[in-house]
Amino acid sequence: MVVLGRIAGPHGIRGQIKVIPFTEYVDGLMEYPVWCLSRDEKNWQIVRPATFFIHDNLLIVTLTGYSDRTSASELKGLLVAVPRSQLPPLSKDGEDGYYWTDLIGISVVNMQGEPLGTVAGLFETGANDVLRVRLSGSSKDELIPFVDQVIRQVDLESRQITVDWELGY
């Protein structure tokens, strides 16, 4: 499963839910006819989205079988995922980009081979994506732009990203 969003809570009184998408585009989840919901990423419940619309960078969704606010409220906090087999394949060399979920948890080292930390998350700035790297032995994060000048190599097999970056830039 690949997590593509999280349910923020109910919307209105007719069973609609607010979904925070983790996709590049707000409507990215609308492409998938079947979703899987889970709190723990182990036990998945299959649901079918019936209707969608976008409101304030959130997806407002009606799921089949959920018709009132009470039932929708029970879904708050659940992760929204799809089977990896439903995602378009990407080239191994990164030409097509990367799925963010594949980058989270990867170790980050600088050009000298010094460990900086691990990827804790990513976000968009409009100009480019940014890695949020949890520094080794710390609870602090370093923000590193995900651009060619900085990201020198992404090796998904060895789970390592090499960056042209020094701490404190």
From Swiss-Prot:
Disulfide bonds listed in the record: none
Signal peptide start and end residues: none
Subunit description: Binds ribosomal protein uS19.
Domain of life according to the entry: Bacteria
NCBIfam families: 16S_RimM
Protein name (Swiss-Prot/TrEMBL): Ribosome maturation factor RimM
Keywords, sorted A to Z: Chaperone, Cytoplasm, Ribosome biogenesis, rRNA processing
Pfam families, A to Z: PRC_RimM, RimM
GO molecular function: ribosome binding
Location of this chain's protein in the cell: Cytoplasm
GO cellular component, as recorded: cytoplasm; ribosome
InterPro entries referenced in this protein's UniProt entry, alphabetically: PRC_barrel-like_sf (IPR011033), PRC_RimM (IPR056792), RimM (IPR011961), RimM_N (IPR002676), RimM_N_sf (IPR036976), Transl_B-barrel_sf (IPR009000)
Organism: Nitrosomonas europaea (strain ATCC 19718 / CIP 103999 / KCTC 2705 / NBRC 14298)
Free-text comment about domains: The PRC barrel domain binds ribosomal protein uS19.
Similarity comment: family membership: Belongs to the RimM family.
Main location: cytoplasm
Role of this protein: An accessory protein needed during the final step in the assembly of 30S ribosomal subunit, possibly for assembly of the head region. Essential for efficient processing of 16S rRNA. May be needed both before and after RbfA during the maturation of 16S rRNA. It has affinity for free ribosomal 30S subunits but not for 70S ribosomes.
GO biological process assignments: ribosomal small subunit biogenesis; rRNA processing
Gene name for this UniProt entry: rimM
Domain PRC barrel positions: 95-169
